[in-house]
Amino acid sequence: VAPGDVDYILLTHAHIDHSGNIPLLVKKGFSGEIITTFATADLCDIMLRDSAHIQEFEAEWRNRKARRSGEPEYEPIYTVADADAATKLLAPVDYGQKITLCDGIEVRFNDVGHLLGSASIEVWITEGDVSKKVVFSGDVGNVNQPIIKDPQLVKEADYLVIESTYGDRTHGEDIPDYVGEFTRILRETFQKGGNVVIPSFAVGRTQEILYFIREIKEKNLLPEFPGFEVYVDSPLAIEATNVFNKNVKGCFDEEAMELVNQGINPLLFRGLKTTITSDESRQINFDTKPKVILSASGMCEAGRIRHHLKHNLWRPECTICFVGYQAVGTLGRKLIEGAESVKLFGENITVNARIEVLKGISGHADMNGLLDWIRGFEKIPDRVMVVHGEDTVTDHFAKLVEDTFGCPAFAPYSGGTVDLAANEIITIGQKIPKKSDEKPSKLKSASAFNRLVAAAKRLLNVVYKNEGLANKDMAKFETQIQNLADKWDR
């Protein structure tokens, strides 16, 4: 479907894996309405612009290299102007508000407890004398998360489209003691005179950590360090926290609202400091007092967190505390897997700091949580379509749904189609192959060889740059290259 032919986008929540391509659709001609909740609209307003800034920065960096090598210029996926155009199309609605999109289509958004403003979406469709109801789960939240409500259940649907991020695993039976574990990490680190550096996702996770720290301070759980300071060093996280504070009513859970009604901001406490400018960020590491530093990105792949790692990883008295998932190949994953040294800004940094993982924090319902959410239907849907997961996970969860509830379930591939009126699968779609489907050993081998080829190309460029070198130096350079070739020509 051409973007210009689309009338509406129904957006479940603001996370970039769900909202991030909307400016591209606008760039390609979409001019309809983006229906979502008020909190999601507020978050998208800052997150899409931030994403666009990253796209523009990457394009600028690539093009500096391209101009030097004579390669064609790289165009950003979308620009800040595209993101601004997208945010102007946001049409927010309240939770529980049933609205008519057009003749034959009505929708309602319900809190699904994944992120501030996140929603499942009920869609009523009427064509002729046939009416069907489809429910899209969005990302179903975990229960007992701080700040936001537990997932709200939906009573009925003819069809359910459900996510399966954790459709093949559980978070464990024990209820984690986040505050107790976090207090231990802070105490042990501060006693040694070190900093606790927390790579944290700017939206959602940072606010949860602030909530825990407020509780630690309010309950005086660290009496020996009552005035410790906490730095939030991420402009996006600061903006997102302001959005949380703006969207209290209707989004915060009972416990958080109790605090609000007492005049207490659940995300504010003595010793909280925010840094906007780069100069303010740099000053943090000149302060020798033990402190907490919260900074993005959560997987340490970009952002100011890399500067804080450079200044703290080599210090045995410091702790790097991870509070979110670390994808394979990221710097964060390397650190939690025991890397002895890492490269930051061209410098090898020895890892002497203690590496901790605050386990159990997840914004996603696990396998049992997803099943419980389906149990909330008073009548099980006629068919369940499982999406938003790895292929093996979606297939596993679809079979689990069939075995548990006795209703037909399947995991469609890209382009899969279902006749809703007749409840028939027209096409299952086409599997899009991923490079990650290859065996890890092959991937590593290919990656290593690609780096080797890149190194060889760089060497050739260096040779060309040295045209006109003095004969004596050129002969020396040639000998070094020949010796290297002889060493590996076997």
PLM region spans:
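Charged, amphipathic alpha-helical linkers/stalks
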Residues: 415-475
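Hard-cation-handling environments
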Residues: 183-330, 342-343, 393, 400-404, ...
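His/Asp/Glu-rich metal-coordinating catalytic cores
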Residues: 1-10, 15, 19, 26-208, ...
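Short, surface-exposed amphipathic charged segments that create phosphate/polyanion-binding patches used
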Residues: 105-109, 243-251, 371-372, 421-433
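A polyampholytic, Gly/Pro-enriched intrinsically disordered region
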Residues: 55-60, 248-261, 343, 426-451
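C-terminal, active-site-flanking charged/polar segments
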Residues: 315, 390-434
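Short, compositionally biased "basic patch" segments
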Residues: 146-161, 248-255, 326-352
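Generic long, charged, amphipathic alpha-helical segments
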Residues: 343-374
